[in-house]
């Protein structure tokens, strides 16, 4: 492939210049010829001088990075979005006036002020000046304008007036792209790149924009034959065929987490004429990139040879070079670990332990036991550092699964579904707290080494929060207060796990007139757990000594959400749905949730695209009130 690019996200998590240079050393020797810097507003300039010195880079510092990359024969492309993902620009009193939600309106997915208004002339004046300053730093022929996930088009009074006068959101998007193109291509003489996901919502826009805009086609599903849309109904479609037909050039953009994502997206792309590949790496605030270096090197080498033949052998060859070992058992083991993927540690209160998690617990223990003996055999300082980070990732995975198991045991203990002595739970919780302390210490040491002087220390924040959560639960077990709780189980049907339906659950107890709020938020499943799809169980605590009489379930937002069953277990008994009392809004098959089977009650619109295109539909509340009875 002509362009073999790798992106580092220094907008969400700053890195030191030394680390960026180290990353350039590694990637330039791994087949890459381009470094993409995801910046947002991280560079402090005359136009945008508001970022604190310790939270931003100077133009001179970035020029130092560009010069270093040039010596390694790597081009450096900046990414500065001028539509969505502009929160770094909009968080200052001098610039907040550029925001689309500046008048206090709520956007599609909340009040996050991250989108600029495309109807204000000063928006373009600001970005033209800032883009000119950024372009002076980066001599690359390319300039990436972001423009992904622009959820809030048409919300401010100026934009609403344009829509009232006959323009569509797609028209506004097209005019914005043309204005930006006139700046980037017309005035700065750069080739404009952009993310392509918004054309899933506004497909008619593609035929109205300049054909020399380069599309960056990002897809992160582990296995891809034909890509799916990112949010709207996850429709299967063929974007590269469309780009070839219309005459656009494009890059494919997988993510670093899983090699199979890189392989299958590349395999799909090689049926067409990609300009290259861009491996995206996003925020690493609570971890580091080291553990992903084998995946990163693999993608670079894969694109360097432009074929997906024998990817397993290529991956093992990359690992031979990194770790200096040719032992086949080691290479097979490392290959299995990296293909195994990873989960995030901050979802341990989500629901009961799943079948997939049970299996992963066994696998993690096996991986740790088998790979640990190779630690002293790994050669080279970089190889040793990467190996230690992989070991740490396995340890964190084990910690996460132990916390998940701990929470599941607590729910069984409270509900009486399993006889567990509290001393066993106390012992398990104490071991988890000790392990959290150890992991936090290791991460803190890594931070001091790789990110000296960069604050806040997000790893400390994460593990401190988790420690306090576990510690609080442990104190309840020790005092016996945990038995004052009951357990509420709700099983969702979520055909689109990327949906964003906001949910409110309230409970009314016998003899009480007031609804008690139980949960408010978006029930996001772990999309990497195939043992649940599309049914996901979530758990909440309720009163242990009151008789639950009714459940109120409300939802609003873009799309819909299904419920297959719900139940409560506490000291007063086991309670399940008896009847549906009333519904409002759009509720399909309201009686389906009365029986614990595969059917579902659906609240909202199953066509998320239709709701996305109508602001008012996203504000509609859909609700169902359910009476409970004791089994």
Name the predicted role of every residue range.
Residues 566-568:
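Extracellular beta-strand elements of beta-rich domains used
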Residues 553-559:
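Short beta-strand-plus-loop segments that form exposed binding edges in beta-rich domains
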Residues 497-500, 510-545, 585-593:
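Extracellular carbohydrate recognition and processing domains
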Residues 483-488, 497-504, 519-521, 573-630:
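Activation corresponds to long, low-complexity, non-globular regions
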Residues 547-551:
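Exposed beta-strand face motif in extracellular beta-rich ectodomains
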């Amino acid at each position: 492939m002509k362009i073999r690019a790798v992106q580092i996200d220094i907008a969400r998590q700053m890195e030191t210049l030394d680390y960026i240079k180290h990353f350039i050393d590694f990637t330039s020797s791994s087949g890459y010829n381009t470094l993409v810097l995801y910046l947002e507003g991280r560079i402090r300039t005359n136009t945008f001088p508001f970022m604190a010195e310790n939270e931003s880079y100077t133009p001179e510092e970035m020029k130092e990075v560009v010069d270093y990359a040039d010596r390694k024969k790597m081009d450096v492309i900046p990414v500065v979005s001028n539509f969505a993902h502009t929160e770094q620009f909009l968080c200052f009193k001098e610039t907040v006036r550029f925001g689309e939600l500046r008048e206090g309106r709520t956007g599609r997915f909340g009040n996050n002020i991250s989108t600029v208004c495309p109807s204000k002339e000063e928006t373009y004046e600001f970005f033209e000046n800032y883009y000119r300053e950024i372009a002076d730093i980066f001599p690359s022929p390319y300039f990436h304008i972001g423009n992904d996930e622009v959820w809030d088009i048409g919300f401010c009074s100026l934009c609403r007036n344009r829509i009232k006068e006959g323009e569509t959101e797609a028209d506004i998007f097209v005019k914005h792209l043309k204005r930006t193109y006139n700046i980037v291509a017309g005035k700065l003489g750069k080739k404009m790149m952009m993310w392509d996901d918004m054309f899933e919502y506004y497909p008619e826009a593609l035929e109205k924009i300049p054909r020399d805009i380069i599309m960056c086609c990002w897809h992160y599903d582990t296995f891809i034959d034909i890509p799916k849309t990112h949010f709207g109904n996850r429709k299967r479609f063929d974007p590269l065929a469309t780009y070839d037909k219309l005459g656009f050039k494009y890059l494919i953009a997988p993510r670093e987490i899983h090699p199979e994502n890189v392989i299958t997206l590349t395999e799909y792309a090689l049926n067409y004429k990609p300009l290259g590949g861009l491996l995206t790496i996003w925020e690493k605030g609570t971890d580091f990139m080291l553990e992903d270096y084998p995946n990163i090197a693999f993608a670079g080498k894969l694109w360097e040879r432009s074929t997906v033949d024998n990817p397993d052998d290529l991956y093992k060859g990359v690992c031979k070079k990194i770790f200096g070992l040719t032992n086949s058992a080691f290479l097979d083991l490392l290959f299995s670990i990296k293909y195994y993927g990873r989960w995030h540690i901050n979802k341990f209160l989500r629901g009961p332990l799943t079948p997939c998690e049970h299996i992963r617990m066994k696998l993690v223990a096996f991986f740790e036991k088998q790979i640990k003996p190779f630690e002293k055999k790994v050669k080279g300082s970089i190889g040793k550092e990467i190996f230690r980070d992989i070991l740490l990732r396995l340890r964190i995975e084990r910690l996460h699964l132990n916390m998940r198991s701990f929470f599941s045991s607590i729910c069984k203990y409270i509900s009486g579904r399993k006889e567990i002595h509290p001393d066993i739970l106390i012992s398990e919780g104490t071991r988890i707290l000790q392990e959290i302390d150890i992991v936090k210490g290791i991460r803190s040491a890594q931070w001091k080494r790789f990110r000296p002087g960069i604050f806040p220390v997000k790893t400390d924040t994460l593990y401190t929060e988790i420690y306090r959560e576990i510690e609080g639960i442990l104190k309840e077990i020790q005092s016996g207060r945990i038995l004052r709780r009951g357990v509420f189980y709700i099983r969702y049907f979520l055909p689109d796990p990327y949906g964003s339906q906001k949910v409110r659950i309230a409970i009314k107890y016998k003899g009480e007139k007031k609804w008690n709020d139980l949960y408010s938020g978006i029930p996001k499943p772990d999309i990497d757990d195939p043992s649940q799809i599309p049914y996901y169980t979530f758990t909440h605590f309720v009163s242990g000594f009151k008789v639950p009489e009714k459940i109120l379930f409300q939802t609003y937002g873009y799309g819909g959400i299904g419920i297959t069953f719900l139940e409560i277990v506490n000291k007063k008994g086991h309670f399940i749905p008896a009847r549906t009392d009333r519904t409002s809004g759009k509720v399909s098959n309201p009686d389906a949730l009365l029986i614990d089977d595969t059917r579902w009650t659906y609240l909202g619109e199953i066509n998320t695209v239709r709701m996305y295109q109508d602001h008012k539909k996203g504000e509609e509340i859909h609700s169902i009130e359910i009476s409970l009875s004791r089994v």
